[in-house]
Each structure stands twice: as C-alpha cells, then as structure tokens.
Amino acid sequence: MFSYSDFCSIGTAMILSATTFLMGVFFSNMPYDYHLLFNPNSTQEHFDLALRHYQILHETPLPVIVTLCVVAGIGLVGGTIKVFKPNPELQMFEYCSLGLYVLAICVFLTNVKTGIDCSVSHNWGEVTENQGLAVIASSNIILLVMFAGVIILQIGLWYSNWDLQKRLKEFYAQEEREAANAGKKTEKVDNAKKNDNKSKGAQKRKNAKK
C-alpha cells in the first residue's frame, strides 16, 4: 500500500512535469514577444510577425488543445494531492504553490486566450493592436515567472522534507545508540551487583564454617 508521503512524491512529480511542459509552451512565444517588449529598435514588421504568429495559434487543432488541458489538469491534481494533508510547518508554501499555478491558468484564460481571439477579430477594445500584442507578450512573461515560482517552491519543499527525514533518521539513530549504551551500563551494574552478592554469600559461608 502507498503511504501519503508516497502520494506526495507522485504529486510533486506531476506538478514539476506539468509546469515545465507549460513553461516550454509559453517560452516558444519568446522569439516574437522579445522584440515587442525588450527590443528598442523594434519595427512594425515585428508586430506584424507577432500578429501572424498568434493568428496561427488561434487555429490550433483541437487534439493539441485537449492535450494542453490534460497536462494543466495533471498539475492541478498533483497540487491538490499535496494540500490534502500538508505538513503544518510547510503548508503555506504548498498553498502558495497551488495558488500560483491556478493564478497562472487564470492569466492565460483572461489575457493570452482573449488576446489570441482578438488577433483574429481585430476587436482590441480601448487599446491599439500593437498595445494588445504587447499585453499578450507581457502576459506570457508573467506566466513564465509564475511557473518558475511554482518550480522553485516545489524544489524548496522537496529539500525541506528531505532534510527533515535526514534529521529524523539521525535523531532516531542517536536515540538507539544512547539506549544501547544505557542498556550496557545497566547490565554492567547488574553484573557487579551479582558478583558482589556472590562474594558476600561466600564470605558468610566461610564465617559460618568457622
């Protein structure tokens, strides 16, 4: 039977696998987003290329979208497993990790997904097309930062649990050594008492013979 700690290990693997996969998906937009956000010499051509890129993403086949949703769901399941019975000393980090993951999904749905739809409809609301594309690019950067935060938290939690288990093993080993030493001392005292009693008994018998 699996213990809860075993399920937590599986949950950590699920979170890390899903998060790194999603980071790769959004990082693939960086060749277009970089020029919109960080290139001071960006031209309208860069915005046109980014627009075309997001228009192509809008035509993503349904099986690919379903796969992306399944991967995101795996991360959510892993996070739920870990917050079911969290370590009281580390539970805030577990909650923050799951919260960051959920918030990243919300940012995708409200900013990136909406922006991709707008790239096709050209209905950008109160902002210009270039500003809307910059918002999508900024949202992708925010997503990468959030997912990186999830990974850092999970690595920190794993290390904390590993260090705790290591310290517990050392503590129990020390307790066993102390108990063994105490047992040896007690045995020596008992043997000394027995020898002393034997000596006294022998002395009494000698005195009785006299």
UniProtKB/Swiss-Prot annotation:
<feature type="topological domain" description="Cytoplasmic">
    <location>
        <begin position="85"/>
        <end position="91"/>
    </location>
</feature>
<keyword id="KW-0472">Membrane</keyword>
<keyword id="KW-0813">Transport</keyword>
<feature type="topological domain" description="Cytoplasmic">
    <location>
        <begin position="1"/>
        <end position="9"/>
    </location>
</feature>
<dbReference type="GO" id="GO:0005789">
    <property type="term" value="C:endoplasmic reticulum membrane"/>
</dbReference>
<feature type="topological domain" description="Lumenal">
    <location>
        <begin position="29"/>
        <end position="59"/>
    </location>
</feature>
<comment type="function">
    <text>Involved in amino acid permease processing and required for the efficient translocation of structurally related amino acid permeases from the endoplasmic reticulum to the plasma membrane. SHR3 may function as a permease-specific 'adaptor' molecule that functions in conjunction with the SEC62/SEC63 complex. Yeast cells may require SHR3 to expedite the processing of permeases to ensure their rapid expression at the plasma membrane in response to changing environmental conditions.</text>
</comment>
<protein>
    <recommendedName>
        <fullName>Secretory component protein SHR3</fullName>
    </recommendedName>
</protein>
<dbReference type="InterPro" id="IPR013248">
    <property type="entry name" value="Psh3/Shr3"/>
</dbReference>
<feature type="topological domain" description="Lumenal">
    <location>
        <begin position="115"/>
        <end position="130"/>
    </location>
</feature>
<feature type="transmembrane region" description="Helical">
    <location>
        <begin position="60"/>
        <end position="84"/>
    </location>
</feature>
<keyword id="KW-0256">Endoplasmic reticulum</keyword>
<dbReference type="GO" id="GO:0051082">
    <property type="term" value="F:unfolded protein binding"/>
</dbReference>
<keyword id="KW-0812">Transmembrane</keyword>
<feature type="transmembrane region" description="Helical">
    <location>
        <begin position="10"/>
        <end position="28"/>
    </location>
</feature>
<feature type="topological domain" description="Cytoplasmic">
    <location>
        <begin position="161"/>
        <end position="210"/>
    </location>
</feature>
<feature type="region of interest" description="Disordered">
    <location>
        <begin position="178"/>
        <end position="210"/>
    </location>
</feature>
<feature type="compositionally biased region" description="Basic and acidic residues">
    <location>
        <begin position="178"/>
        <end position="199"/>
    </location>
</feature>
<keyword id="KW-1133">Transmembrane helix</keyword>
<keyword id="KW-0811">Translocation</keyword>
<dbReference type="GO" id="GO:0005783">
    <property type="term" value="C:endoplasmic reticulum"/>
</dbReference>
<dbReference type="GO" id="GO:0015031">
    <property type="term" value="P:protein transport"/>
</dbReference>
<dbReference type="GO" id="GO:0043332">
    <property type="term" value="C:mating projection tip"/>
</dbReference>
<feature type="transmembrane region" description="Helical">
    <location>
        <begin position="131"/>
        <end position="160"/>
    </location>
</feature>
<dbReference type="Pfam" id="PF08229">
    <property type="entry name" value="SHR3_chaperone"/>
</dbReference>
<dbReference type="GO" id="GO:0006888">
    <property type="term" value="P:endoplasmic reticulum to Golgi vesicle-mediated transport"/>
</dbReference>
<dbReference type="GO" id="GO:0006457">
    <property type="term" value="P:protein folding"/>
</dbReference>
<dbReference type="GO" id="GO:0090114">
    <property type="term" value="P:COPII-coated vesicle budding"/>
</dbReference>
<comment type="subunit">
    <text>Monomer.</text>
</comment>
<keyword id="KW-0653">Protein transport</keyword>
<feature type="transmembrane region" description="Helical">
    <location>
        <begin position="92"/>
        <end position="114"/>
    </location>
</feature>
<feature type="compositionally biased region" description="Basic residues">
    <location>
        <begin position="201"/>
        <end position="210"/>
    </location>
</feature>
